[in-house]
From Swiss-Prot:
Natural source organism: Capra hircus
Name of the featured protein: Lactotransferrin
Residues at which hydrogencarbonate 1 binds: R140, A142, G143
Binding, Fe(3+) 1: D79, Y111, Y211, H272
Positions that bind Fe(3+) 2: D414, Y452, Y545, H614
Residue sites binding hydrogencarbonate 2 per the record: T478, R482, A484, G485
GO biological process terms on file: antibacterial humoral response; antifungal humoral response; bone morphogenesis; innate immune response in mucosa; iron ion transport; negative regulation of apoptotic process; negative regulation of lipopolysaccharide-mediated signaling pathway; negative regulation of osteoclast development
Keywords attached to this entry: Disulfide bond, Glycoprotein, Hydrolase, Immunity, Ion transport, Iron, Iron transport, Metal-binding, Osteogenesis, Protease, Repeat, Secreted, Serine protease, Signal, Transport
Domain of life according to the entry: Eukaryota
Recorded family membership: Belongs to the transferrin family.
Gene assigned in the entry: LTF
Any one GO molecular function term: metal ion binding
Positions of disulphide bridges: C28-C64, C38-C55, C134-C217, C176-C192, C179-C202, C189-C200, C250-C264, C367-C399, C377-C390, C424-C703, C444-C666, C476-C551, C500-C694, C510-C524, C521-C534, C592-C606, C644-C649
Amino acid sequence: MKLFVPALLSLGALGLCLAAPRKNVRWCAISLPEWSKCYQWQRRMRKLGAPSITCIRRTSALECIRAIAGKNADAVTLDSGMVFEAGLDPYKLRPVAAEIYGTEKSPQTHYYAVAVVKKGSNFQLDQLQGQKSCHMGLGRSAGWNIPVGILRPFLSWTESAEPLQGAVARFFSASCVPCVDGKAYPNLCQLCKGVGENKCACSSQEPYFGYSGAFKCLQDGAGDVAFVKETTVFENLPEKADRDQYELLCLNNTRAPVDAFKECHLAQVPSHAVVARSVDGKENLIWELLRKAQEKFGKNKSQSFQLFGSPEGRRDLLFKDSALGFVRIPSKVDSALYLGSRYLTALKNLRETAEELKARCTRVVWCAVGPEEQSKCQQWSEQSGQNVTCATASTTDDCIALVLKGEADALSLDGGYIYTAGKCGLVPVMAENRKSSKYSSLDCVLRPTEGYLAVAVVKKANEGLTWNSLKGKKSCHTAVDRTAGWNIPMGLIANQTGSCAFDEFFSQSCAPGADPKSSLCALCAGDDQGLDKCVPNSKEKYYGYTGAFRCLAEDVGDVAFVKNDTVWENTNGESSADWAKNLNREDFRLLCLDGTTKPVTEAQSCYLAVAPNHAVVSRSDRAAHVEQVLLHQQALFGKNGKNCPDQFCLFKSETKNLLFNDNTECLAKLGGRPTYEKYLGTEYVTAIANLKKCSTSPLLEACAFLTR
């Protein structure tokens, strides 16, 4: 079976070099039958040589999680619900390998939880109250946890007063929820079809139990909606004409055909995963063990021992019997990224109080990059009356990850990062709009975005330096992966040279976010104490537009890649910063692609490319709310806001361009909720995609895994 690309296999082989001298993995078994299978596995692996396996027995998945966190075991396989538990404090375990299901031609590492209804029934997801519901079983992901978690805001549930089942029983007019206590909650068993003691039973003795049972409950007309997984409809209705009689309820309160489950689902549920410690977790060794084990004992590999099989009368020991193999999970993926925001939200909704849930739904959590942005964000939060609160990360990629996990809601990004965020599933919400002579008569909020000019700036005194003579010079960049400072100039250079060896093109550089040991970080300065050199946030003195221009102004670099406004904002007395207050605009020139140079006043005829405006991004399910809150916030704290400058200004910073660009006039609406490709434009997306062939980022690798 060929389920692994060479890159994944080579990553597994890397464990040979990086593993501890004693190549042993302590596997945690949660029962005597599991321990017995583990012992059989141990014996067979011993014959193959390293890595070896030792079997540790505990009484439950939670006990295994504790053993791994306490360094008394190394690995265990968990379902998605327990992966969530394992990722919480104090355990902080992360998934390192995922089980693969499906077929060799169509391998899957997740399924979709969906709400199925009959075509012609006249209600949407937010109109389910009073309808009749069919569930596969109490406590099951697709049949209970996810739909009930998503419906939680509509439930009249006081946590301390009653169990959740009581609120669900009142919400639906009648239900079939196998495994529930029918005496305590008769309404939740009312639609079930089992006879006598088998009514509402937690087994196939109840005809409406399980995925197919819940769908049959809908088919028979007993219920109005069935909560199942996407394959259930296809398995029970192989003919398209029959499937066309059913539809899916979408989170945006619309309906879609049953084959549109990738766009219309309640949540994506990942497969079972092997978890390990986040620090000193032996993940390379664990992957080597799994890779060798599946090669020798995987599907149809061995009669004497089957890794994905259990003795008669037993099921899913150590791994699911239906698994085909494993795929390695990228190191950037923690438990929250693995589970996804929709699934996480559903689980959180089942745990939080009504007050916590309301607060989370109404506020917007903004992600600040670095301490200076955090400080400004805290001021914003205080002035907003906590309508906006703050999360903080050390890099933009880490902020994007927080939004993906639902730990933050939004941030404003440069076009290069919009590309990354878009590849990860986030969407543009509003654009930073500057003053415009072309559309001066239009309301800024409704005005089309015009983009900005990416330029290469040099000192006038550096005579003879042109675009064609940059090789071997010293360069200043806003940050790796940013538009004007990296993507545009380095994309042009890569196209001209046919090489991705950027560290060899320039003699030295400051490109925050690059490898600190490389020449691309040689010119960076860090903070006032010389710490955090080359970090992609405001701790690095030469980070961002202003930082890259300062790098040039202080004669550290020969050329700065910035936007055309940067020179104007930091010369001729426009900036009060000590390093900039005496700078003259006439002392700088622009490099044109034709090999000439021009004054900075002639940027319209001497630029590298037109770059898309910075834009706010969020998850699609939060986009409308983020826009609503931002419109209100800029009415208070925008350029012409009633509380700016007296209390707080969104588009003004003590240093430069914190949270938003300082030259932003307003945040503008984006008509029709465009995709990231449409917002950035085909040419720009193609250019970045080509540049990413030179090098990708851990976050892009993680998102490629999560969205495949």
